[in-house]
């Protein structure tokens, strides 16, 4: 009898059965691992989200924004606007966007993701990044994460930027290359260095793999990292990608440190 069903009826039955199974598995999963707030771990009704109190503590970066640096502007001009800071000291990348400021709940989430191996946070953080970078994602051809120093990668066992890159790729269907950009050497901590010292510190730290150069040449690259701090790392990566022939390089992160972007001499 089942073989004689009209196609539409069979499809409807398959959709109903699939939905029922998904809901059943979700219900069973919630019994085993009840949903909690991603930040404070308080009880919630669904996974991968925040309670009201933690949500209010997130400093989302909202428009109007400087088209280059992604920092808030005092008023909306009705179109793309470049801040005085970006005009005075243009970044090497084309545009940067961050979902939040690196403080409060957002800082706790990023630290949990990076240092406590809470890789499930990629879902929530990826959703924030997708919303913040929708205009960059529309123009991107390839997603490239900021690479990690081999020694640090050995001890941490994962590159948080690569995990975020794959999450954004999963959400958008854009291709991801974790090996196109390589870390050639370790660098000194950037804290306390002037802009000139930061640039020297990062020079030669990154390179494009020869066998991946064809993925970069002539394409719009979306560079992914977790946090923009001093901006020196993403600028160094952008310079290398542009030298390899990238048509443009945009930057998308979870957060930025307030007061650190733009760079100051």
Which residues are covered by each model-predicted region?
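Glycine-rich phosphate/pyrophosphate-handling loop used in enzymes and phosphotransfer proteins
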Residues: 1-225, 229-265
